[in-house]
């Protein structure tokens, strides 16, 4: 199959998965379904796992930095929501260390410090070979209920 058909077929599959539900809630919202995110929690860590598909790649054939940033943001935001309630990102800093070309990716969000009015979180993204590909730190503010 040529590259164009692979991207077209993968993109159609991703869209069908996202359209499978109209839920817009933590753990299952349109963008997470579209990107194929599997979200789980272990102890004080939120794990976002997904498989790299051709529509997620940039023209160089590696996972697009925006997808990496999205997965890391989701891992931290979902952890905050899971432990203390919904919040919003005030700032996020990302370091890209290694390219991700294919395979299954694991992203782990955790707390650096839980404050009363501000949360400091971090996220680490690992390639399928378990090498650290990117890491992020972020400042979050809890949203009032």
Summary of predicted features, one role per range:
Residues 1-145:
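Terminal targeting signals and extreme-terminal segments of soluble enzymes
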């Amino acid at each position: 199959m040529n590259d164009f058909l692979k991207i077209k077929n993968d993109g159609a599959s991703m869209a069908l998965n996202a359209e499978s539900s109209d839920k817009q809630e933590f753990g299952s919202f349109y963008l997470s379904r579209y990107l194929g995110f599997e979200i789980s929690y272990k102890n004080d860590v939120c794990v976002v796992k997904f498989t790299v598909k051709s529509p997620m790649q940039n023209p160089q054939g590696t996972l697009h930095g925006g997808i990496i940033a999205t997965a890391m943001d989701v891992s931290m935001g979902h952890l905050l929501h899971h432990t203390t309630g919904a919040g919003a990102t005030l700032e996020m800093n990302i370091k890209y260390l290694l390219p991700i070309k294919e395979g299954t990716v694991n992203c782990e969000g955790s707390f650096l410090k839980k404050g009363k009015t501000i949360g400091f979180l971090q996220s680490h993204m690992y390639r399928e070979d378990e090498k650290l590909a990117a890491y992020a730190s972020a400042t979050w503010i809890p949203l009032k209920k």
